[in-house]
Amino acid sequence: KAGVGFKAGVKDYRLTYYTPDYETKDTDILAAFRVTPQPGVPAEEAGAAVAAESSTGTWTTVWTDGLTSLDRYKGRCYHIEAVVGEENQFIAYVAYPLDLFEEGSVTNMFTSIVGNVFGFKALRALRLEDLRIPPSYSKTFQGPPHGIQVERDKLNKYGRPLLGCTIKPKLGLSAKNYGRAVYECLRGGLDFTKDDENVNSQPFMRWRDRFVFCAEAIYKAQAETGEIKGHYLNATAGTCEEMIKRAVFARELGAPIVMHDYLTGGFTANTSLAHYCRDNGLLLHIHRAMHAVIDRQKNHGMHFRVLAKALRMSGGDHIHAGTVVGKLEGEREMTLGFVDLLRDDFIEKDRSRGIFFTQDWVSMPGVIPVASGGIHVWHMPALTEIFGDDSVLQFGGGTLGHPWGNAPGAVANRVALEACVQARNEGRDLAREGNEIIREAAKWSPELAAACEVWK
């Protein structure tokens, strides 16, 4: 009797998982995969294989399939289109029923969608380009601990981008000298300074010493400037328990913000830290160390916009998002695409910016994008125009490399930023008149003039 209706053996995935007539539901999680099949494998079979292996399928028919409703739980490849200008490359759209995923777990979502299928031998390469997260799923996540508006209110800073600086050299300084550099940068006019992503708790500088000296620097700079200051204290550690212990100590010192390396630390650790930060009034800065391992290849891995969406769900108030400046125009559009996905409530589908699906975040708070890496005062007009007010512009070498020292480097950046914001508010075109605006400001700021000379 057990054998009735059950036929053992291997059958093509497309017979079950390729359903071009399927109408997607509002509750489905939708994925866009860039699929490069092996020679001789049809696109439909490759797309169906991805849907199967990332949902209910396995390599052969099993009789326990009859004990559940595959129609209810299977992923479906519902549309395939060829990639223009690429030979044997396709975008496969897959719909996943919501019941396949644990609520509030980015870890489980990724384990399902990208956990197993990337090593599949029918595929030469596979890249997850985008995900549509339905409100019915995103609502199961807390999201960013505080979000953009709450951060502005905490800092009492409005109407301009925030300024940051990564302390260099990133490894080798003692805690006392590290704290001194933090103080000089904040005293000069920056809003934030930052631990580098690989500063955790090494023999030359243990975390507790660093936290204490940085807190002292923050309070001293606040007292002298009358502005609220912060330093991203990197709480990333070898265990979740140790990470939370460091965050607790940061809170006890009265620090306003901590930091986490969310890809090396992992999504489970990140979500735990985000929950702690919301409950205890700490802002959370996120560094994306290791992202290029996942997102750099154009035909394999995962696009950063997917990692950015996952971070917004898992929780973070800031995340690094590249700089755009000096890159290709196309990359600018792609970067601004995922910057919008981080900040806005509702983002329309726009393939020219790499956005494959309309994304509705409903009321989930936004994340502030951080522009960092190789930027200096001459880039300030472009950065102000491209990223707008809700951003952090981070100048590491562009502050600490100033010929007169750290504090004058900070002054130069603050003067350049204030000049750009004022010019923008007066209706001037930053893209066209940027260099002229910086030159005018440099006439009455010797610190800015010196910086302009070094990086001209």
From Swiss-Prot:
Secretion signal span: none
Documented EC number(s): 4.1.1.39
Keyword Chloroplast found: yes
UniProt PTM: The disulfide bond which can form in the large chain dimeric partners within the hexadecamer appears to be associated with oxidative stress and protein turnover.
Top-rank EC class of the record's enzyme: lyase
Function recorded in the entry: RuBisCO catalyzes two reactions: the carboxylation of D-ribulose 1,5-bisphosphate, the primary event in carbon dioxide fixation, as well as the oxidative fragmentation of the pentose substrate in the photorespiration process. Both reactions occur simultaneously and in competition at the same active site.
Gene field: rbcL
Catalytic reaction equation(s): 2 (2R)-3-phosphoglycerate + 2 H(+) = D-ribulose 1,5-bisphosphate + CO2 + H2O; D-ribulose 1,5-bisphosphate + O2 = 2-phosphoglycolate + (2R)-3-phosphoglycerate + 2 H(+)
GO MF terms, alphabetically ordered: magnesium ion binding; monooxygenase activity; ribulose-bisphosphate carboxylase activity
N6-carboxylysine PTM positions: 194
Keyword list, A-Z: Calvin cycle, Carbon dioxide fixation, Chloroplast, Disulfide bond, Lyase, Magnesium, Metal-binding, Methylation, Monooxygenase, Oxidoreductase, Photorespiration, Photosynthesis, Plastid
Listed NCBIfam families: PRK04208.1 (NF003252)
The protein's name: Ribulose bisphosphate carboxylase large chain
Cofactor(s) of this protein: Mg(2+)
Family statement: Belongs to the RuBisCO large chain family. Type I subfamily.
Gene Ontology biological-process annotations: photorespiration; reductive pentose-phosphate cycle
Chain positions of site Transition state stabilizer: 327
Predominant subcellular localization, coarse grouping: plastid
Binding, substrate: 116, 166, 170, 288, 320, 372
Lineage: Eukaryota, Viridiplantae, Streptophyta, Embryophyta, Tracheophyta
Free-text cofactor note: Binds 1 Mg(2+) ion per subunit.
Cellular component per GO, a single term: chloroplast
